[in-house]
Amino acid sequence: MCIRDSAAAVLAAVGILGGCGAKNAESQAPAETQAAEQSAQESSVEESRETSAEESKTETEKNGTLSVTYVKSPLNVPSIVELDQEIFASVFGPMGYDVQYSDLTTGPEQTQALASGDIQFLNAVGATSVILSASNDADIKIMSIYSRSPKAFKLFAKDDSIKTAEDLKGKKVAGPKGTILHELLVSYLNNAGMTEDDIEFMAMGIPDAQAALAGGSVDAALLAGPTAYNMEKDGFYIVTDGEGLTEATIVTATSEKFYEEHPELVKAFLTAQKQVLDEMDADHAAAVSATAKATGLEEAAVEEMYGLYDFDMEIKESDIEAMEKTEKFMEDTGMIENPVDVASLILDVE
């Protein structure tokens, strides 16, 4: 065979092989395309499932963070000891959650943040604020008692020119609205046959109310905790305290929705609260020292005020009765428009 014929044969063979390869490629292409499309569809379905699952998670699950209120006033020793000992972190950390502290201190701010989901636990909120929130159809439930301290809440005047409720007529009185202090004021006026309309109530937080009274821009101020202690030492006149006017019940709270989604976290919170109280009992001196440091008070002052507080976390029948009395008072005085069944606010933690 000549070289030309050999070359032709080779080319023919290559052509045949190439043709077979092309045919094979053509026959394989639809199968590969179908497999790729199927894989893409499966991936899309999986991503859709993941997105749906992610959207169904609460903010807490996505962030791995629990937001808890931190309120030092009036003299919230448990909150101070908890932060000092990092007890929430020790309880929630192993469960995969970080703890973030909120600096919202007024009742209305706290209950609104709970309703919006920005905060999961209210660790010290007045029963007055809880009842007010529930009256407005908010989802809020009481987990435990934080404290009882009627004598720690006080109404101050600059001097003894204001000694009675009648002396307040037409006067400017400053204090936090929708709180235990507010309840104290309205109850005090009511006992004298007066209402809030007989005075000029100026809603503001405790620090601002203290400054307003000290500066002379108001005639009286509703104060509690270290602020009240210091004002008394500075010679300001105590018109009345909360004894006989309010039980000054402070509670811990969450939402029913959060409990239904995370019962284990609510139980963990209560475990942590009990641990805090045990720490306080085990080392009273350390609790006093931490509180003095956090509030700027002398340890002797903390000791003097400590006795005004009952931090037993158990919800007793007397607590429910006290809150029912508060609810009726708020309803009778127009502080709330819709009645609230206090017993239904107690979270049944199983």
Give the ranges of each region predicted by the language model:
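Flexible hinge/capping segments at coil-to-helix
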Residues: 157-172, 260-264
